[in-house]
């Protein structure tokens, strides 16, 4: 077996990484929202990528209960042509 020498010491991620990310939190829980409305397009656009995909909860920090409501609201808004299914193909 090959021996590659001493292992490098692990550095602490939070202190030395210049791209430290904030802790994720659920916007809907913090605002006290009970139900997500499909007509609130400004909120829905924050959770849709430029190419039309819904951003997953592990990236946004949204709780599972609200992520399901968000998914349904985005799909309803798409069906009613309030939101596009995909990006603009100019």
From Swiss-Prot:
Q: Which SUPFAM superfamilies does this one have? A: Ribosomal protein S18 (SSF46911)
- Pfam families recorded: Ribosomal_S18
Q: Which domain of life is it from?
A: Bacteria
Q: What GO terms in the biological process aspect are recorded for it?
A: translation
HAMAP family, A to Z: Ribosomal_bS18 (MF_00270)
Q: What does this protein do?
A: Binds as a heterodimer with protein bS6 to the central domain of the 16S rRNA, where it helps stabilize the platform of the 30S subunit.
Family per similarity comment: Belongs to the bacterial ribosomal protein bS18 family.
- Write the protein's name: Small ribosomal subunit protein bS18
Native species: Bordetella petrii (strain ATCC BAA-461 / DSM 12804 / CCUG 43448)
């Amino acid at each position: 077996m090959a021996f590659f020498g001493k292992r490098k010491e692990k550095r602490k991620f939070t202190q030395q990484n210049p791209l430290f990310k904030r802790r994720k939190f659920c916007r809907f829980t913090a605002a006290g929202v009970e139900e997500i409305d499909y007509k609130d397009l400004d909120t829905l656009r924050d959770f849709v990528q430029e190419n039309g995909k819904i951003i997953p909860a592990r990236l946004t920090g949204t709780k599972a209960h609200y992520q399901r409501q968000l998914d349904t609201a985005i799909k309803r808004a798409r069906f009613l042509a309030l939101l596009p299914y995909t990006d603009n193909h100019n």
